[in-house]
A protein has these predicted regions:
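Short acidic-hydrophobic, aromatic-tinged amphipathic segments that line or gate anion-handling sites
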Residues: 1, 105-109
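Adenosine-nucleotide cofactor-binding segment
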Residues: 1-26, 78-80, 84
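Generic hydrophobic alpha-helical segments
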Residues: 2-6, 89, 114
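C-terminal capping/lid region of NAD(P)-dependent oxidoreductase domains
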Residues: 12, 90, 95-104, 112-132
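Short catalytic-loop micro-motif centered on adjacent basic/acidic residues
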Residues: 16-19, 39-43, 100-103
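Substrate-positioning beta->alpha
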Residues: 20, 109-110
Length: 132
């Protein structure tokens, strides 16, 4: 359960915002890791389109759950969003203040193992493929 280290790191409070790409098996961990009055933004469904959802925990924490997609947005909207993200986060990403979690690294020859890990939804963070 990935929520446990998040709760430990925040003194049991949880985080104010989760930007989530996976869903399905991770829904309830997200709810557990989100602070009271926090927000979860669902931007992807890599783990599937359906899953368990603890409505009692959602209500008790008064969490805002926001769904977004780029499929129904125009090219101009996508460009504006990309520009805003770069302006808001670009410097911190470049300075190393923000970083994406790295789950694992595989040689390109082991791409099937990497894909199996991803399909099994066993990873937390990015899976990197390296070229020798």
């Amino acid at each position: 359960h990935w929520a446990d280290p998040v709760l430990a790191a925040t003194g049991g409070t949880g985080v104010d915002l989760i930007i989530h790409h996976i869903n399905k098996k991770k829904n309830n961990d997200n709810l557990k890791a989100t602070a009271i009055m926090g927000r979860i933004i669902n931007v992807g469904r890599l783990g599937g389109f359906n899953g368990n959802f603890d409505f009692d925990l959602h209500a008790a924490r008064r969490i805002q759950y926001i769904g977004v997609t780029f499929r129904t947005r125009s090219i101009d909207e996508i460009r504006a969003i990309t520009k805003a993200v770069q302006e808001d986060l670009g410097r911190d990403l470049g300075d190393g203040k923000l970083a994406l979690p790295i789950d694992s690294s595989f040689d390109i020859e082991d791409v099937n193992d990497a894909l199996a890990r991803m399909k099994a939804n066993e990873h937390f963070g990015k899976i990197i493929l390296t070229l020798s």
